[in-house]
Amino acid sequence: LFASNSSLVAAKVAERSAETGEHYITRTAAEYRSMVKKAAGGGLVIAFTTLAKFALYALALSAFWAGFWAGFNYAVSFVLVQLLHFTVATKQPAMTAPAMAAKLKELGTGDAIESFVDEITHLVRSQVAAVLGNVLVVYPVVLGIALLMLHTLGQPPINTKQAEHVLESLHLLGPSVLFAAFTGVLLFASSIIAGWAENWFVLHRMDSALHYNPRITGLLGAERAARWARFLRENLSGFAANISLGFMLGLVPAFAAFFGLGLDVRHVTLSTGQMAAASATLGLQVLQMPAFWWAMASLPFLGALNVSVSFYLAFSLALRAQNVSGVDRARIYAAIRARLRTAPLSFFVP
């Protein structure tokens, strides 16, 4: 009974995520440019998130409260990104994976496999556009604001010791790549929470309850109540994902430290912002520091692990939930390799 119930819940969660995930896959040049713009907007918001995080460091709070307020900072920022219709790249894979899994049901002919490979290229370049849009904006914005603070206030957001620690914590040969993979697990978990929340909302017909509840309509009026019901129906899963992810990014390291686990998180956009702040503090001499280049080299790996781990977990769940089996993986892999040989740029630009 438990296995059957869990499978049904997973199926509904995957179904809701698949509906959302379709919006994150760009297929045309216009959609690609739109994704880059949305990601640039997300990078702008995350730049201020990074600076707010350093401001919290200055308060010297206890581990729990530092984690709580860091999580609150992240959650507010992610919700703001959502409400402004921007995007944070690493949140997309866990939503797009169920949409891709659903398409595996349609495979059979050679044309269908080629069509699926087309979708893979669309997905990969959508992720590339989103990550680059975030990273290429967050770095110069944080760097610029930090330098402005240095020249106007006489001090940057972080001191030299903190800046050196940031670079060391992002070293490619350190545990950062493992922490990035762990962050991918948290990204997947937030998508599960989002799918569950939206499924609960739809199952209990909360939009109808809000729309037709006499007290709510009496307080807000029928038209405004209908708008609120529609707004929550369209945005609830995003709120659930963003708030849960924000607090997990803030609190999980604090709880892990309490139990002596030594786990941390590495989110590529946030890490890029931290690197920018460290660069502003250390000045031009940072270009002569090996630690800077090791940290810079780690960023592509952080992004790849954030994206791939969350996508893999969500894709695996969606395959089980949607009872997709008997897929000829060898033909799919061969088609992907052929596409990489004949049109490698299709994975990066439309």
Regions found by a protein language model. Name each.
Residues 1, 7-14, 23-26, 205-350:
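Long, compositionally biased intrinsically disordered regions
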